[in-house]
């Protein structure tokens, strides 16, 4: 998720198992552990300049970097793979791969076998990390936020991105599976994430609201009351066929945020983490019946560690 700089934050993103999150900043990069919340490391401005996007491969030494902000060292049309384990004092010694395009890169998603690179109207998928080759590419609706997520499970080839209806999501493997809707009023989607076992999906909007959907048991999701009515027209029928979130919450500051799933506190209680561009950290718990409450709050930008990444 990218955002106009607030306290120096240009974008935020969780790693694949959602145990860490990356913070791209005017001053470089910060990496945080989620539970417990602490800074794991950082790259300073001298090393990487101001950064527009950063993606971390699990908890490894590999980062995907895209330049941005007011004083970038790297281009906004290139994805650079940074290997922090490589020896060398110069930043060029750490760069091991480069993917270059003709238009700005808006998002990058990685897992152990693939890298997904998102432009405004197109998505590219490559094998990764050894000898990358393009697997496929496809057009999307206008996607100025670069919203996209790749299921971290190697057994499931799932990709999710904005649907053609405003406020909807397209969930695909080789073909469309289901359409999910966050609400009736238009809103900009900022982040989408799968749960660890792909049973749930969460999505956040520019209104600071996070919606949680059930994927494994879709009967938990709410549906339009019109679904109980008989035959309806084609436009209403498309609306009726959609599924609505089983639970939702809004962060108090109503600030744009990214969201992901935290550790489960019990069999029937799940948790969602919301990280906001204003520097705040929120943890909510929810149950299958839709109850949702905040459990923890902190300010991650006030947490500093002098260790490099």
Curated annotation (Swiss-Prot):
* Source organism: Rattus norvegicus (Rat)
The record's Gene Ontology cellular component field reads: cytosol; phagophore assembly site; phagophore assembly site membrane
Biological process annotations from GO: autophagosome assembly; autophagy; autophagy of mitochondrion; cellular response to starvation; glycophagy; nucleophagy; pexophagy; positive regulation of autophagosome assembly
Instruction: Return the PANTHER family for the record.
Output: WD-REPEAT PROTEIN INTERACTING WITH PHOSPHOINOSIDES WIPI -RELATED
Gene3D superfamilies in alphabetical order: YVTN repeat-like/Quinoprotein amine dehydrogenase (2.130.10.10)
Transmembrane feature ranges: none
Q: How does it assemble?
A: Interacts with WIPI1. Interacts with WIPI2. Interacts with ATG2A and ATG2B. Interacts with ULK1. May interact with the PRKAA1, PRKAA2, PRKAB1 and PRKAG1 subunits of the AMPK kinase. May interact with NUDC.
Q: Domain comment, in the record's words?
A: The L/FRRG motif is required for recruitment to PtdIns3P.
Keyword annotations from UniProtKB, A to Z: Autophagy, Cytoplasm, Lipid-binding, Repeat, WD repeat
- List, in alphabetical order, the Gene Ontology terms for molecular function in this entry: phosphatidylinositol phosphate binding; phosphatidylinositol-3,5-bisphosphate binding; phosphatidylinositol-3-phosphate binding; protein kinase binding; protein-macromolecule adaptor activity
Tell me where the WD repeats sit in this chain: 4-42, 184-223
Q: What protein name does the entry list?
A: WD repeat domain phosphoinositide-interacting protein 4
Where is the motif (L/FRRG motif)? 180-183
Q: Which SUPFAM superfamilies is this protein grouped with?
A: WD40 repeat-like (SSF50978)
């Amino acid at each position: 998720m990218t955002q106009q700089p607030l306290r120096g934050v240009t974008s935020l993103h969780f790693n694949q198992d959602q145990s860490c999150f990356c913070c791209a900043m005017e001053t470089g990069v910060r990496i945080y552990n989620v539970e417990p919340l602490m800074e794991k490391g950082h790259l300073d401005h001298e090393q990487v300049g101001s950064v527009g996007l950063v993606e971390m491969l699990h908890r490894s030494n590999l980062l995907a970097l895209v330049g941005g902000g007011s004083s970038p060292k790297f281009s906004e049309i290139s994805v650079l793979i940074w290997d922090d384990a490589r020896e060398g004092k110069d930043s060029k010694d750490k760069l091991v791969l480069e993917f270059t395009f003709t238009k700005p890169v808006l998002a990058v998603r990685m897992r152990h076998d693939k890298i997904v690179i998102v432009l405004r109207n197109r998505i590219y998928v490559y094998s990764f990390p050894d000898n990358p080759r393009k697997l496929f590419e496809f057009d999307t609706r206008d996607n100025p936020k670069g919203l996209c997520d790749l299921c971290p499970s190697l057994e499931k080839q799932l990709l999710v991105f904005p649907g053609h209806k405003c406020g909807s999501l397209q969930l695909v493997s080789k073909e469309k599976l289901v359409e999910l809707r966050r609400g009736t009023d238009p809103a900009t989607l900022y982040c989408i994430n799968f749960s660890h076992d792909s049973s749930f999906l969460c999505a956040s909007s520019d209104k600071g609201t996070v919606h949680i959907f059930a994927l494994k048991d879709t009967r938990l999701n709410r549906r339009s009351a019109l679904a109980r009515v008989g035959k309806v027209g084609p436009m209403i029928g498309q609306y009726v066929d959609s599924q609505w979130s089983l639970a939702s919450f809004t962060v108090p500051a109503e600030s744009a945020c990214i969201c992901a799933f935290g550790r489960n506190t019990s069999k029937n209680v799940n948790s969602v983490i919301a990280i906001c561009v204003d520097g705040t950290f929120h943890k909510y718990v929810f149950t299958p019946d839709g109850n949702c409450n905040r459990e923890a709050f902190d300010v991650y930008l006030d947490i500093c560690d002098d260790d490099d990444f």
